């Protein structure tokens, strides 16, 4: 699905034009209202700077938190406007509301190269309902549209889909274009062997991905809390480890499917057990057939790490989604950190394409200080999963075809 991108527009298309850009500025704040991680803001800078440098008037639309269709003073974009001003080295004004006469007057008064941030679009319930009247009001700010919010591209909302009915051209920004290139490319035309590492606590949240990847991958490695549902389905004792009792048949089916399709499905052979869910818990390493009593598995074990590393060394494209254990606790972060280091090394020294597919695995890679070493780090959690599942993203489908 090839979409028109911002790179196809030059100064003749952009000079003096008001461009509505949907960005993903849903960043974490601490209790003092300060941004603790500005990755998403920095990710949008190339698109914004391209528009500034081509003399466009830039109008940014973003959501923040879940204000449930009402103004919530704690969810205003004030800290975002301040951080963006610092990163761009120019003032970014913030409107009091994303629609209305006052906001439109502000967008109409912009000079070429100016940047205006519209207040939180989710202060209006119509945003998430994809209300076309609301979309029309948002669109009235601008002459054309750029979607650079991959993290929200799986939502059919007014600012991601509705506005494209009223603005032309509607194109992909650089971040969205890069996400599609890597994630879609890894699924449609990867360098092989292709491996996926799927982690996280629940099979239920990764069913679609695992199912879809079984049709695409040469190898799949599974880690995280979800492994215990597979073990229990095999009839093993898992102690007090997390298990989704209603997904045991599904786990059996996935193993059978992998076998039938000739996909190498690797599950850990040993795990790190804890006597309680705590960073200071007593821990021990155990083979998967020796778990019992009050122990719970919180990480993959050292033997499994080696097996996974050897399997990954043979691959040319690797997608990673979900941690191997409770990496927030240092004691149970070894599996996740080892995978992160392995991928960074393969990326750097073996020209392997490494894609970190959103969510907790991104946090783990950043915590390990290895983000720069990966081929691609996805900014979208749900959007990455849906793309890997082979679903069409509404925010992408709505853009003009190339």
UniProtKB/Swiss-Prot annotation:
It catalyses: (2R)-3-phosphoglycerate + ATP = (2R)-3-phospho-glyceroyl phosphate + ADP. Keywords: ATP-binding, Cytoplasm, Glycolysis, Kinase, Nucleotide-binding, Transferase. Its EC number is 2.7.2.3. One of its GO terms (cellular component) is cytosol. GO terms for biological process: gluconeogenesis; glycolytic process. SUPFAM superfamilies: Phosphoglycerate kinase. Pathway: Carbohydrate degradation; glycolysis; pyruvate from D-glyceraldehyde 3-phosphate: step 2/5. GO terms for molecular function: ADP binding; ATP binding; phosphoglycerate kinase activity. Signal peptide: none annotated. It holds the Pfam family PGK. The keyword Transit peptide does not apply. HAMAP family: Phosphoglyc_kinase (MF_00145). Belongs to the phosphoglycerate kinase family. Monomer. This is Phosphoglycerate kinase. It comes from Prochlorococcus marinus (strain MIT 9312). The gene is pgk.
């Amino acid at each position: 699905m090839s979409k028109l991108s911002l790179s196809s527009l030059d100064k003749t298309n952009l000079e003096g034009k008001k461009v509505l850009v949907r960005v993903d500025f849903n960043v974490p704040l601490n209790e003092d209202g300060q941004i603790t991680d500005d990755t998403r803001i920095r990710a949008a800078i190339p698109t914004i700077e391209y528009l500034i440098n081509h003399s466009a008037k830039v109008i940014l639309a973003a959501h923040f938190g879940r204000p449930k269709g009402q103004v919530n003073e704690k969810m205003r974009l004030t800290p975002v406007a301040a951080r963006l001003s610092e990163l761009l080295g120019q003032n970014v004004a913030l409107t009091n509301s994303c629609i209305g006469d006052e906001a439109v007057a502000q967008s109409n008064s912009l000079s070429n190269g100016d940047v205006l941030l519209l207040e939180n679009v989710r202060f209006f319930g119509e945003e998430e309902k994809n209300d076309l009247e609301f979309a029309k009001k948002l669109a009235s700010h601008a002459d054309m549209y750029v979607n650079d919010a991959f993290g929200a591209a799986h939502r059919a909302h007014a600012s991601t889909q509705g506005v494209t009915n009223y603005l032309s051209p509607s194109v992909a920004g650089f971040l969205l274009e890069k996400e599609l290139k890597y994630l879609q490319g890894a699924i449609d035309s990867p360098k092989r062997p292709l491996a996926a590492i799927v982690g996280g606590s629940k099979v239920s949240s990764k069913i679609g991905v695992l199912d879809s990847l079984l049709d695409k991958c040469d190898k799949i490695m599974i880690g995280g809390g979800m492994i215990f549902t597979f073990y229990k389905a095999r009839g093993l004792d898992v102690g007090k480890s997390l298990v989704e009792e209603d997904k045991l048949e599904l786990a059996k089916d996935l193993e059978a499917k992998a076998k039938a399709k000739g996909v190498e499905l690797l599950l850990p052979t040993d795990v790190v057990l804890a006597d309680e869910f705590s960073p200071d818990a007593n821990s021990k390493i155990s083979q998967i057939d020796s778990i019992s009593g009050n122990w719970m598995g919180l990480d993959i074990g050292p033997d499994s790490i080696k097996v996974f590393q050897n399997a990954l060394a043979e691959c040319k494209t690797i997608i990673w989604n979900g941690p191997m254990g409770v990496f927030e606790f240092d004691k149970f972060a070894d599996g996740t950190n080892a995978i992160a280091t392995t991928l960074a090394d393969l990326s750097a020294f073996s020209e392997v394409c490494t894609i970190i597919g959103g969510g907790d695995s991104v946090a783990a890679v950043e915590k390990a200080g290895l983000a720069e070493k990966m081929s691609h780090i996805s900014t979208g959690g749900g959007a990455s999963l849906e793309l890997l599942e082979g679903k069409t993203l509404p925010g992408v489908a709505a853009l003009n075809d190339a």
